[in-house]
Amino acid sequence: MQDTAHEQIRKETWSDPWSRDWFIIEQLVSRDFKLKFRRSFLGVLWSVLNPLLMMVVMAIVFTAMLRFSSSSIPSFPLYIILGNITFTLMADSTTYGMHSIIDNASLIKKVRINRFVFPIEKVLFALVNFSFSLIAVAFVMIFVGIAPTGFALLLPLFIVYVGTFCVGLSFLLSAAVVFFRDIMHLWTIVLTVWTYATPLFYSEEILPSWFRNLETFNPMYHYVNFIREILLYGRMPSLELNFACIVCSLISLALGWFVFSRHEKRFILFI
């Protein structure tokens, strides 16, 4: 008996491992998106409102209360929100990704599936939320009177840079936390320290020279600068900045994939 059209499509799709993995990733992203905003009155609007509200709070604290100002920053609110959404993208990606293997333990035990899809899916889910945050950025740009330039078209390149970096970190953390659960608590502390070590809510001009030199080794410093260059300052990121972003992304991906692929066969024994 001939296969039905539905069965034929299913066979053709699942005969290709990459198509199968991508299908699984799509389904997981859809599931997480629905779960996040389930029973929420404003739903996806929170992805727009949250960075806006955070920007307002930080702008008040650093300008009105701490009297911070810098002539080199065209718009402090835009400066804040760009730093905030970039760091939030990394923090959410890695936190979700870190839990991705142990949270899907039952599925991994029952179904033969490539385990790398779980950390990647969490990063893609965070990127979906990030895309809604860009709506908030557009509102702020309109409010402060800064028009996007042609360099805003480099935003997809920024997403590739930071997305690759987050995938690598998620590979590393998701593998490590299978064997050492304490990493979940340590990572929260690391993110807190990392937040204040990165010029998100303050200008790097206030940092001592020795600390500014250390920022060279801070990947998020480079990614935050990249998005500010194209959306806040409206100019082409330097070759040095692009090189730093590429190096950080590739090192993260290589290290994360090495650790993940080397230990993934043992996950089933510890989850």
Residue ranges of model-derived segments:
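Hydrophobic transmembrane alpha-helices and immediately adjacent juxtamembrane helices
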Residues: M1-I271
